[in-house]
Amino acid sequence: MTTHRKPSQEQGFLNGQFLLAMPGMSDERFARSVVYICAHSGEGAMGFIINQLQPVQFPDLLRQIGVIGEEDLIILPDRAQHMVARNGGPVDRTRGFVLHSDDYMVDSTMPVSDDVCLTATVDILRAIYGGGGPERALMALGYSGWAPGQLEMEVAENGWLTCDAPLDMLFDSDIEGKYSRLMLHMGIDMSQLVSDAGHA
Protein backbone atom coordinates (compact mmCIF):
# COMPACT_ATOMS: atom_id res chain seq x y z
CA MET A 1 0.00 0.00 0.00
CA THR A 2 1.34 3.41 -0.95
CA THR A 3 1.91 5.91 1.85
CA HIS A 4 0.98 9.46 0.89
CA ARG A 5 2.76 12.20 2.77
CA LYS A 6 1.16 15.57 3.37
CA PRO A 7 3.18 18.47 1.95
CA SER A 8 5.36 20.33 4.40
CA GLN A 9 4.16 23.78 5.44
CA GLU A 10 7.50 25.49 5.67
CA GLN A 11 7.43 29.09 6.76
CA GLY A 12 7.03 31.45 3.83
CA PHE A 13 5.60 28.85 1.46
CA LEU A 14 1.98 29.03 0.34
CA ASN A 15 0.94 25.40 -0.22
CA GLY A 16 -2.83 25.05 0.10
CA GLN A 17 -3.50 28.79 0.12
CA PHE A 18 -5.25 31.21 -2.21
CA LEU A 19 -3.66 34.00 -4.19
CA LEU A 20 -5.96 36.88 -5.14
CA ALA A 21 -4.77 39.17 -7.90
CA MET A 22 -4.47 42.80 -6.88
CA PRO A 23 -6.24 45.42 -9.03
CA GLY A 24 -2.88 46.53 -10.42
CA MET A 25 -2.03 43.04 -11.77
CA SER A 26 -0.03 43.69 -14.95
CA ASP A 27 -0.65 40.28 -16.53
CA GLU A 28 -4.18 40.37 -17.96
CA ARG A 29 -4.39 36.58 -17.91
CA PHE A 30 -4.54 36.79 -14.12
CA ALA A 31 -6.82 39.84 -13.74
CA ARG A 32 -9.28 39.29 -10.84
CA SER A 33 -8.05 35.72 -10.58
CA VAL A 34 -8.17 33.39 -7.60
CA VAL A 35 -5.31 30.89 -7.70
CA TYR A 36 -5.07 27.82 -5.48
CA ILE A 37 -1.41 27.00 -4.76
CA CYS A 38 -0.67 23.27 -4.85
CA ALA A 39 3.11 23.26 -4.58
CA HIS A 40 5.51 25.94 -3.39
CA SER A 41 9.15 25.49 -2.43
CA GLY A 42 12.56 26.92 -3.15
CA GLU A 43 12.28 25.29 -6.58
CA GLY A 44 9.26 27.35 -7.62
CA ALA A 45 5.48 27.15 -7.38
CA MET A 46 2.47 25.80 -9.24
CA GLY A 47 -1.25 26.23 -8.84
CA PHE A 48 -4.56 26.63 -10.63
CA ILE A 49 -6.79 29.56 -11.44
CA ILE A 50 -10.16 28.41 -10.10
CA ASN A 51 -12.47 31.25 -11.16
CA GLN A 52 -12.05 31.22 -14.94
CA LEU A 53 -14.15 28.88 -17.05
CA GLN A 54 -13.10 26.87 -20.08
CA PRO A 55 -15.53 26.69 -23.02
CA VAL A 56 -15.50 22.88 -22.87
CA GLN A 57 -17.96 21.01 -20.64
CA PHE A 58 -16.93 17.95 -18.64
CA PRO A 59 -19.03 15.48 -20.70
CA ASP A 60 -17.53 16.84 -23.93
CA LEU A 61 -14.03 16.46 -22.50
CA LEU A 62 -14.72 12.86 -21.51
CA ARG A 63 -15.85 12.18 -25.07
CA GLN A 64 -12.85 13.95 -26.62
CA ILE A 65 -10.32 11.89 -24.66
CA GLY A 66 -12.15 8.62 -25.28
CA VAL A 67 -13.43 7.91 -21.77
CA ILE A 68 -17.02 7.74 -23.06
CA GLY A 69 -18.77 7.51 -26.40
CA GLU A 70 -21.56 9.68 -27.76
CA GLU A 71 -24.14 7.14 -26.63
CA ASP A 72 -22.92 7.38 -23.01
CA LEU A 73 -23.74 11.09 -22.62
CA ILE A 74 -27.34 10.38 -21.66
CA ILE A 75 -26.37 8.08 -18.77
CA LEU A 76 -23.79 10.31 -17.11
CA PRO A 77 -24.31 10.83 -13.36
CA ASP A 78 -25.90 14.18 -12.54
CA ARG A 79 -22.69 15.53 -11.00
CA ALA A 80 -20.68 14.70 -14.12
CA GLN A 81 -23.34 16.26 -16.36
CA HIS A 82 -22.98 19.61 -14.60
CA MET A 83 -19.24 19.66 -13.91
CA VAL A 84 -17.40 22.47 -15.69
CA ALA A 85 -13.75 22.81 -16.58
CA ARG A 86 -11.69 25.71 -15.26
CA ASN A 87 -8.89 27.53 -17.03
CA GLY A 88 -6.11 26.51 -14.67
CA GLY A 89 -3.46 28.74 -16.21
CA PRO A 90 -1.36 29.43 -19.27
CA VAL A 91 0.99 26.42 -18.97
CA ASP A 92 0.25 23.05 -20.63
CA ARG A 93 -3.32 24.08 -21.45
CA THR A 94 -4.37 20.77 -22.99
CA ARG A 95 -3.52 18.77 -19.87
CA GLY A 96 -6.22 18.03 -17.32
CA PHE A 97 -5.91 18.15 -13.53
CA VAL A 98 -8.46 17.41 -10.80
CA LEU A 99 -8.34 19.07 -7.39
CA HIS A 100 -10.45 17.04 -4.98
CA SER A 101 -11.28 16.08 -1.43
CA ASP A 102 -9.06 13.52 0.27
CA ASP A 103 -11.61 10.70 0.17
CA TYR A 104 -10.16 9.57 -3.19
CA MET A 105 -6.55 8.40 -3.33
CA VAL A 106 -4.58 6.47 -5.95
CA ASP A 107 -0.84 6.02 -6.45
CA SER A 108 -0.62 9.14 -8.61
CA THR A 109 -2.53 11.35 -6.16
CA MET A 110 -0.55 14.21 -4.60
CA PRO A 111 -1.72 15.53 -1.23
CA VAL A 112 -1.80 19.33 -1.25
CA SER A 113 -3.12 20.07 2.24
CA ASP A 114 -4.73 18.14 5.08
CA ASP A 115 -7.98 17.76 3.11
CA VAL A 116 -7.22 18.58 -0.55
CA CYS A 117 -5.45 16.40 -3.11
CA LEU A 118 -4.44 16.64 -6.76
CA THR A 119 -4.75 13.85 -9.32
CA ALA A 120 -3.76 14.26 -12.97
CA THR A 121 -4.55 10.87 -14.49
CA VAL A 122 -7.56 9.74 -16.50
CA ASP A 123 -8.49 7.23 -13.78
CA ILE A 124 -10.16 9.90 -11.67
CA LEU A 125 -12.23 11.04 -14.66
CA ARG A 126 -13.40 7.47 -15.18
CA ALA A 127 -14.26 7.23 -11.48
CA ILE A 128 -16.36 10.41 -11.62
CA TYR A 129 -18.04 9.19 -14.81
CA GLY A 130 -18.89 5.94 -13.04
CA GLY A 131 -20.59 7.79 -10.20
CA GLY A 132 -17.68 7.31 -7.80
CA GLY A 133 -14.52 9.28 -7.23
CA PRO A 134 -14.13 12.03 -4.64
CA GLU A 135 -17.08 13.72 -2.97
CA ARG A 136 -15.84 17.16 -4.03
CA ALA A 137 -13.82 17.93 -7.14
CA LEU A 138 -12.96 20.58 -9.68
CA MET A 139 -11.25 20.03 -12.99
CA ALA A 140 -8.76 22.41 -14.60
CA LEU A 141 -7.08 22.48 -17.99
CA GLY A 142 -3.57 23.90 -17.78
CA TYR A 143 -1.81 25.29 -14.73
CA SER A 144 0.00 28.37 -13.46
CA GLY A 145 3.72 28.09 -12.75
CA TRP A 146 6.40 30.26 -11.19
CA ALA A 147 10.18 29.96 -11.37
CA PRO A 148 12.27 29.85 -8.16
CA GLY A 149 11.73 33.08 -6.24
CA GLN A 150 9.28 34.49 -8.79
CA LEU A 151 6.11 34.14 -6.72
CA GLU A 152 7.81 35.53 -3.62
CA MET A 153 8.86 38.57 -5.64
CA GLU A 154 5.36 39.09 -7.07
CA VAL A 155 3.82 38.92 -3.59
CA ALA A 156 6.44 41.32 -2.21
CA GLU A 157 5.67 43.73 -5.06
CA ASN A 158 1.96 43.64 -4.14
CA GLY A 159 0.85 41.69 -7.18
CA TRP A 160 -1.05 39.21 -4.99
CA LEU A 161 -2.91 38.99 -1.71
CA THR A 162 -2.64 35.67 0.11
CA CYS A 163 -5.19 34.01 2.36
CA ASP A 164 -6.28 30.64 3.70
CA ALA A 165 -8.38 28.49 1.37
CA PRO A 166 -11.64 27.31 2.99
CA LEU A 167 -12.96 24.16 1.33
CA ASP A 168 -16.35 25.74 0.63
CA MET A 169 -14.66 28.58 -1.25
CA LEU A 170 -12.46 26.18 -3.21
CA PHE A 171 -15.15 23.78 -4.37
CA ASP A 172 -18.36 25.83 -4.49
CA SER A 173 -20.10 26.39 -7.81
CA ASP A 174 -20.26 30.20 -7.69
CA ILE A 175 -17.27 30.67 -9.94
CA GLU A 176 -17.89 34.22 -11.13
CA GLY A 177 -18.50 35.58 -7.62
CA LYS A 178 -15.55 33.83 -5.98
CA TYR A 179 -13.10 36.75 -6.21
CA SER A 180 -15.48 39.29 -4.64
CA ARG A 181 -16.62 36.87 -1.94
CA LEU A 182 -13.06 36.07 -0.95
CA MET A 183 -12.27 39.77 -0.69
CA LEU A 184 -15.26 40.14 1.65
CA HIS A 185 -14.14 37.03 3.55
CA MET A 186 -10.82 38.79 4.13
CA GLY A 187 -12.60 41.95 5.28
CA ILE A 188 -11.44 43.99 2.29
CA ASP A 189 -13.61 46.72 0.77
CA MET A 190 -13.07 46.46 -2.97
CA SER A 191 -13.97 50.11 -3.48
CA GLN A 192 -11.12 51.18 -1.23
CA LEU A 193 -8.55 48.59 -2.27
CA VAL A 194 -5.42 50.07 -3.79
CA SER A 195 -2.28 48.46 -5.11
CA ASP A 196 -0.15 49.08 -2.02
CA ALA A 197 -1.87 46.50 0.18
CA GLY A 198 -0.05 43.62 1.82
CA HIS A 199 -0.95 40.22 3.19
CA ALA A 200 -4.31 39.37 4.66
Swiss-Prot record:
Which cysteines share a disulfide bond? none
* A Pfam family per the record: DUF179
- Gene Ontology cellular component list: cytosol
Which family does the entry's similarity section mention?
A: Belongs to the UPF0301 (AlgH) family.
HAMAP family in alphabetical order: UPF0301
Identification of the protein by name:
UPF0301 protein BOV_0485
The organism's lineage? Bacteria, Pseudomonadati, Pseudomonadota, Alphaproteobacteria, Hyphomicrobiales
